[in-house]
């Protein structure tokens, strides 16, 4: 088995800067919005409706008239922190499935790398790709738990992913890459490449 062609190690760090900025914004949005809604408030009314009257909400056209559990689910999914984290999860998925066509990779290759000196050494692309998968797992768990109504699940998940992305961007410490190497040494992931 031959090792795949190496990548410029500055590329994943560049992508980690952008990802950490997005994750920081998602974390702040999640903290500002608070925990996920568990009830629907229709605001203040000038009259008291009859006890047996049924009120159908008109707050959002796509929510009105739906079952209560679906209304709550749609309200949770419409929060800005959820939407941004969902976009970040899609970017992580893109990085796992096709790292060469991921937007941050294209941006680095077309705008940044031509202005830099060639790298001294190339890096195995498998650990950074695995790290993208770990990031995808963490934010996906946060998204699912948020939809299920677990308080603070989304900002905690985005904060964890932010810490990992920031460590990679600022210090070159890729936690997902370290996990990949640990699992590789344990024989769980592939085989360690043999040195000639």
Label for each model-derived stretch:
Residues 1-196:
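Membrane-interfacial helix-loop segments of redox and metal-homeostasis proteins
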């Amino acid at each position: 088995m031959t090792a795949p062609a190496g990548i410029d190690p500055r590329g994943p760090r560049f992508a980690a800067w952008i990802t950490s900025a997005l994750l920081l914004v998602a974390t702040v949005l999640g903290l500002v919005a608070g925990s996920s809604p568990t009830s629907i408030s229709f605001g203040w009314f000038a009259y008291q409706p009859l006890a047996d009257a049924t009120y159908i909400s008109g707050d959002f056209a796509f929510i009105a008239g739906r079952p209560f559990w679906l209304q709550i689910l749609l309200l949770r999914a419409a929060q800005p922190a959820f939407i941004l984290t969902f976009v970040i999860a899609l970017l992580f998925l893109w990085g796992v499935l096709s790292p060469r066509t991921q937007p941050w990779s294209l941006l680095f290759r077309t705008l940044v790398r031509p202005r830099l000196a060639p790298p001294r050494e190339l890096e195995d692309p498998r650990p950074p790709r695995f790290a993208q998968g770990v990031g995808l797992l963490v934010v996906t768990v946060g998204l699912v738990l948020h939809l299920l109504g677990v308080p603070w699940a989304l900002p905690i998940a985005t904060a964890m992913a932010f810490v990992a992305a920031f460590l990679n961007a600022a210090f070159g410490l890729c936690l997902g890459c370290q996990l990949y190497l640990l699992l590789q040494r344990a024989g769980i992931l592939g085989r360690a490449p043999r040195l000639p």
